[in-house]
Amino acid sequence: ADDDCLPRGSKCLGENKQCCKGTTCMFYANRCVGV
């Protein structure tokens, strides 16, 4: 589902989900951030 994603600000490394649309995983910060 489209809502099964990581919202902005969540940890993203090692998670089973992708960052939500409009955000990306910042590797060094381990956070989903807006692009």
Swiss-Prot record:
Domain notes: The presence of a 'disulfide through disulfide knot' structurally defines this protein as a knottin.
Cellular component aspect of the GO annotation: extracellular region
Free-text function comment from the UniProt entry: Binds reversibly and blocks P/Q-type voltage-gated calcium channels (Cav).
Keyword presence, Nucleotide-binding: no
Pfam family for this entry, one: Toxin_30
Family: Belongs to the venom Ptu1-like knottin family.
Broad class of the protein's primary localization: secreted
Transmembrane segments: none
UniProt-annotated location(s): Secreted
S-S pairs: 5-20, 12-25, 19-32
Protein name: Toxin Ado1
